[in-house]
Structure formats: structure tokens, C-alpha cells
Amino acid sequence: YRANDVINNIDNVPEMDDSEKARLKAECKFLRAWAYYHLNVLWRGVPIYMENVESSEATKARSSEAEVWEQILSDLTDCINEPNLPGKYAQGNSSYGRITKGAAYAFRGYTYQFMGDYAKALADFEAIEGLGYALYSPSNGVKGNRDFFQLFKPANEQCDEMIFSVQCVETSGMGNPRGINYGNRCTGGSAWNNYLPNPAFVEMYELS
């Protein structure tokens, strides 16, 4: 909903540079593709909404799995082709962690891979290297079986292997302490899945 809101309305925002509007629109197309990817993997076909609607108007019929993949690829291709979306942010840049062409190539390649189109997936993954991304290597050149652990330390959260990563915030008191109640036990952080939707409640959303 929020991604569609930005995509459809950001052009009407006054006193904002057109290049910034284009970049933000591309970022939101990535996020819309991200959401529809996970919906399509789970349900193999869902209603496609490219505009904001009220809950009472959410009555579209279910689109096919192939149609959803097509929309996902279209959004990611728009990201890649957007000249105002950078390929990669430099370390220390205040925008590091935002969506880039590198993230769009990676996610489109990931999508092609899931679809079984390995040639296109490989082409996208190879394009990432051309943008300056590379596998993590310790700066001191010492190799060991614990190198991989260093990749996830705050000091390396902006290394060249990071394509799309949430940036560490060391300040305490951020976030929501109840979030752990909702996740599945197999998710990172060992969530508790204390709250589960009632099947009858879920069925209320099958409108078409």
C-alpha cells in the first residue's frame, strides 16, 4: 500500500527535485517487487494491485503465478533502468543501506533463479560485480575458518559484499519489543510465534 502510494503520488509533491522523485519511485518499485515476490512464493498467484484501494474495494480476482512474476520482473527492470538510482553507495555515505541498482540486479537474478531461468539469473549476478561488489576478504589477509563470522560484525556492515543490508544502530531503545512474539520459531532471533491468526479470520480475506 505504501509503495503504491509513493509510486502513484510522488510526482505531485511540490518543491522536490525530479531526480529525487525518480530515485524514490525506483526504490518503492523494488519494495513492491519484494512484497509480491514473497506473496507469490507462498501462494503461487495473488491479486495484483498497482493502485491504493480501501479494504472494501479490494475485490480483484487472483492473478496467475506467471502474471505476478511478470509484474515483479517489470518493477525490478524499471529500477535497473532508472538513471537516478545509484549502482552502489560508498562506505560512509549517509544513504548506505538504501536500495541500489546492485540490489535490484541481485533480487531480479534471485527471482530468475527461483523461476528456473538460470541463464538470465547468471547474467544479473555477473552485472553486480561490475558495480563494485565483491566477496568479503579480511583486510589483514589472514585466512581462517572464522573469517565468515567477521562479515556480520558492525565493522564490516558496509564491506563490498553487502548488497542490501539493514544498517546497525547501536543506540538502545530502538524498535518494538513485541516484535519477537509474531515471528516463526525458525526465523533469525528465535521468535516465539505466540500470536497466530485464526483460520476463520484468514478466510475472511478470500473475496474473489
Residue ranges of predicted features:
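Aromatic-lined, polymer-binding surfaces characteristic
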Residues: Y36-H38, G45, S94-G102
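Short linear capping/connector segments at secondary-structure termini
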Residues: M50-E57, G92-N93
